[in-house]
Amino acid sequence: MYNETPIKRRPSTRIYVGNVPIGDGAPIAVQSMTNTKTTDVEATIAQIRALEKVGADIVRVSVPTMDAAEAFKLIKQAVNVPLVADIHFDYRIALKVAEYGVDCLRINPGNIGNEERIRSVVECARDHNIPIRIGVNGGSLEKDLMDKYKEPTPQALLESAMRHVDILDRLNFDQFKVSVKASDVFLAVESYRLLAKQIRQPLHLGITEAGGARAGSVKSAVGLGMLLAEGIGDTLRISLAADPVEEIKVGFDILKSLRIRSRGINFIACPSCSRQEFDVISTVNELERRLEDVTTAMDVSIIGCVVNGPGEALVSHIGLTGGHNKSGYYDEGERQKERFDNDNIVDSLEAKIRAKASQMANRIQIKDTTE
């Protein structure tokens, strides 16, 4: 199976968010953010666990008040995934959640306050061995930058980021990552390109406020795909007006499509036409639903006829090619004698995929123990 990626990652420094390495060649971390009221501890914990179940490496939680900070303490004690506290306006909240074991502090240069407040946050982060994310956003730039540039521009986002990078440099603090997000794809992409040339710290990617599930996924895939293909980016979040679980799925799908990082099954499926010998669309949809729990990276081709089916099956771990009444089954590119009844394809294919995933996972485990 062809699984090489031509992408060469941008060199960067290494930080840790909890036990998750960021930068310096580490796997690109996929993040999301809770959309519950943080003071609703039970609901927030449930959402974090749902995110962790689908593969979230890191979860960000908004902490807008001191009451939310107290709730954060309870939330942190109940979950395993590293948590980032999202801090705006009141720097004292950052100091409080640091006491409660937060794994990373996100501060917004546009509203966190003057240099003295930033110094307080940095010294607290240093004392607790916590990294910081400088999170610039085109929708909340500092007033003087808006006066200077009249609107969010790549140069404005870069200047906002660099003035705070300079502050952290003066304070001899290097445990940080930076983001320069915007809702416009080209604005965000150019901002990240400029920033990538200026610093060596890890970059957190995102198209902010991208939109609903469909449009937001497309916008994020285009913008982040451009950057990732250039080797830019060490962690990412897909911002959707949708269930945060979908953000994680889309994030992994983008990385999977670029062969940067794979988790779970990569379905290769035809859009179907009158040549299909079974219902391709319903088959793929049902298998995606049933096999969400499979984390082994593997390619599965499901093609409704013999035009492209055999060719796709040759480069898949498991392949299915539509045939009259019964469809052909391939394992590691080799046609098997066994054929699947078209009326029972989903059950048959699910069993084969699960067995293959288990076999591949065991193979990887054995390899790891012998190296």
Swiss-Prot record:
One of its GO terms (biological process) is isopentenyl diphosphate biosynthetic process, methylerythritol 4-phosphate pathway. [4Fe-4S] cluster binds at residues 270, 273, 305, 312. It catalyses: (2E)-4-hydroxy-3-methylbut-2-enyl diphosphate + oxidized [flavodoxin] + H2O + 2 H(+) = 2-C-methyl-D-erythritol 2,4-cyclic diphosphate + reduced [flavodoxin]. Keywords: 4Fe-4S, Iron, Iron-sulfur, Isoprene biosynthesis, Metal-binding, Oxidoreductase. Binds 1 [4Fe-4S] cluster. One of its GO terms (molecular function) is iron ion binding. The keyword Iron-sulfur applies. Pathway: Isoprenoid biosynthesis; isopentenyl diphosphate biosynthesis via DXP pathway; isopentenyl diphosphate from 1-deoxy-D-xylulose 5-phosphate: step 5/6. Its EC number is 1.17.7.3. Its cofactor is [4Fe-4S] cluster. The keyword Iron applies. PANTHER family: 4-HYDROXY-3-METHYLBUT-2-EN-1-YL DIPHOSPHATE SYNTHASE, 4-HYDROXY-3-METHYLBUT-2-EN-1-YL DIPHOSPHATE SYNTHASE (FERREDOXIN), CHLOROPLASTIC. Belongs to the IspG family. Converts 2C-methyl-D-erythritol 2,4-cyclodiphosphate (ME-2,4cPP) into 1-hydroxy-2-methyl-2-(E)-butenyl 4-diphosphate. This is 4-hydroxy-3-methylbut-2-en-1-yl diphosphate synthase (flavodoxin). It comes from Shewanella baltica (strain OS155 / ATCC BAA-1091).
